[in-house]
Curated annotation (Swiss-Prot):
Protein family according to the UniProt entry: Belongs to the RecR family.
A Pfam family that the UniProt record links to this protein: RecR_ZnF
HAMAP family assigned to the protein according to its UniProt record, in alphabetical order: RecR
Zinc fingers, C4-type class: 60-75
Role this protein plays: May play a role in DNA repair. It seems to be involved in an RecBC-independent recombinational process of DNA repair. It may act with RecF and RecO.
Protein name: Recombination protein RecR
UniProt keyword list: DNA damage, DNA recombination, DNA repair, Metal-binding, Zinc, Zinc-finger
Biological process terms in GO annotation: DNA recombination; DNA repair
């Protein structure tokens, strides 16, 4: 058994950092050591920022985004096209689409995907909120932007079925050849999706 070389406070910091996605035990130790070495420049301000986030962060009651105000900044942005809603699995997907700056639409965060094996059903996701938003009127298009996994496709089909009968256009992100990708390196599933989603030139 390895000997302890730090106090319990530092060990706790390392253990908590190791729970952050992308950080394993070794990376967490390095991060903790770096924070401690830069106590005034990093550890103090980080501790303060985390305390503020803990106190102020909330989930938007309209779209499911994470913000310090409710409704969130995206929902209250008067320059956005609120008639187009992009449906995403998670807040990280919303942020990724915003970085791409390809559309100035509204969003709806599901909070995951349908996964019967993991016990995740429709009531565990924010699907009812989406149906309510569409039912209120003013929405002309729903863009389903979930991951191209079996669970993602199942979720997309379920949402499409639930929105049937409402006057709204339903589209999904195209799947296939990435920009700069070479056909020889793509798997069969990706090539099949690309062929099926082909567009006119």
């Amino acid at each position: 058994m390895a000997k302890r070389v730090t106090g319990p406070e530092i060990e706790k910091l390392i253990q908590l950092l190791a729970k952050v996605p992308g950080l394993g035990p070794r990376s967490a130790r390095r991060a903790a050591l770096h924070l401690i070495k830069k106590k005034d420049q990093l550890l103090g301000p980080l501790s303060h920022a985390m305390g503020e986030a803990y106190d102020k962060v909330k989930i938007c009651s309209r779209c499911g985004n994470v913000d310090t105000v409710d409704p969130c900044t995206v929902c209250t942005d008067g320059h956005r096209d609120q008639s187009v809603i992009i449906v995403v699995e998670d807040v990280a997907d919303l942020w990724a689409l915003e970085r791409a700056a390809a559309m100035n639409a509204a969003y709806h965060v599901l909070g995951g995907v349908l996964s019967p094996l993991d016990g995740v059903g429709p009531d565990d996701l924010n699907i009812r909120g989406l149906i309510q938003r569409v039912g209120e009127g003013g929405v002309r298009e729903i863009i389903i932007a979930v991951n191209a996994t079996v669970e993602g496709q199942t979720t997309a089909h379920y949402i499409t079925d639930q929105l049937a009968g409402l006057e709204v256009k339903i589209t999904r992100l195209a799947h296939g050849v990435p920009v700069g990708g070479e056909l020889d390196y793509l798997d069969e599933g990706t090539l099949t999706a690309a062929l099926r989603a082909r567009t006119a030139i």
